[in-house]
């Protein structure tokens, strides 16, 4: 396995699960959004404010391409990373892809107090999350080697299921 890549919506647990997986596998953990922030010296909301979503997506595409060239890491991606075909191609080629699925209710609960999510600066975040999931769910599934439900499950249980499901996959 080159890399273990986590995709899914905001609030699915990609960063939390990713850190635990990395610890379990003794691999480095990278979060593409955090790497963008480190490189730019600015947080995601600031990038959205100054460059708009297209500017952020350009940075994201470059970061994903770079991280997917690495070998032996656990990578958590931003929820919208799958929107670009180039990203989906890089993620698929970069290693095993795990789609962490979460219901709208879980996403709302997990993101409610997070001010670092520009797309949720709205009066109705549940509607936005629902619209985003309707568009992105087929794209997550398109590139996923496995789909894992995260609703109301302790992160440790999710990690154990991921490891078990990946062990069942034939090499590629």
Curated annotation (Swiss-Prot):
<dbReference type="GO" id="GO:0004765">
    <property type="term" value="F:shikimate kinase activity"/>
</dbReference>
<comment type="subunit">
    <text>Monomer.</text>
</comment>
<dbReference type="Pfam" id="PF01202">
    <property type="entry name" value="SKI"/>
</dbReference>
<feature type="binding site">
    <location>
        <position position="79"/>
    </location>
    <ligand>
        <name>substrate</name>
    </ligand>
</feature>
<keyword id="KW-0067">ATP-binding</keyword>
<dbReference type="InterPro" id="IPR000623">
    <property type="entry name" value="Shikimate_kinase/TSH1"/>
</dbReference>
<keyword id="KW-0460">Magnesium</keyword>
<keyword id="KW-0808">Transferase</keyword>
<keyword id="KW-0028">Amino-acid biosynthesis</keyword>
<keyword id="KW-0547">Nucleotide-binding</keyword>
<keyword id="KW-0963">Cytoplasm</keyword>
<dbReference type="InterPro" id="IPR031322">
    <property type="entry name" value="Shikimate/glucono_kinase"/>
</dbReference>
<dbReference type="GO" id="GO:0000287">
    <property type="term" value="F:magnesium ion binding"/>
</dbReference>
<feature type="binding site">
    <location>
        <position position="117"/>
    </location>
    <ligand>
        <name>ATP</name>
    </ligand>
</feature>
<keyword id="KW-0479">Metal-binding</keyword>
<protein>
    <recommendedName>
        <fullName>Shikimate kinase</fullName>
        <ecNumber>2.7.1.71</ecNumber>
    </recommendedName>
</protein>
<dbReference type="GO" id="GO:0005524">
    <property type="term" value="F:ATP binding"/>
</dbReference>
<keyword id="KW-0057">Aromatic amino acid biosynthesis</keyword>
<feature type="binding site">
    <location>
        <position position="136"/>
    </location>
    <ligand>
        <name>substrate</name>
    </ligand>
</feature>
<comment type="function">
    <text>Catalyzes the specific phosphorylation of the 3-hydroxyl group of shikimic acid using ATP as a cosubstrate.</text>
</comment>
<comment type="similarity">
    <text>Belongs to the shikimate kinase family.</text>
</comment>
<dbReference type="InterPro" id="IPR023000">
    <property type="entry name" value="Shikimate_kinase_CS"/>
</dbReference>
<feature type="binding site">
    <location>
        <position position="153"/>
    </location>
    <ligand>
        <name>ATP</name>
    </ligand>
</feature>
<comment type="pathway">
    <text>Metabolic intermediate biosynthesis; chorismate biosynthesis; chorismate from D-erythrose 4-phosphate and phosphoenolpyruvate: step 5/7.</text>
</comment>
<dbReference type="GO" id="GO:0009073">
    <property type="term" value="P:aromatic amino acid family biosynthetic process"/>
</dbReference>
<dbReference type="GO" id="GO:0008652">
    <property type="term" value="P:amino acid biosynthetic process"/>
</dbReference>
<dbReference type="GO" id="GO:0005829">
    <property type="term" value="C:cytosol"/>
</dbReference>
<keyword id="KW-0418">Kinase</keyword>
<feature type="binding site">
    <location>
        <position position="33"/>
    </location>
    <ligand>
        <name>substrate</name>
    </ligand>
</feature>
<feature type="binding site">
    <location>
        <position position="57"/>
    </location>
    <ligand>
        <name>substrate</name>
    </ligand>
</feature>
<feature type="binding site">
    <location>
        <begin position="11"/>
        <end position="16"/>
    </location>
    <ligand>
        <name>ATP</name>
    </ligand>
</feature>
<feature type="binding site">
    <location>
        <position position="15"/>
    </location>
    <ligand>
        <name>Mg(2+)</name>
    </ligand>
</feature>
<dbReference type="InterPro" id="IPR027417">
    <property type="entry name" value="P-loop_NTPase"/>
</dbReference>
<dbReference type="GO" id="GO:0009423">
    <property type="term" value="P:chorismate biosynthetic process"/>
</dbReference>
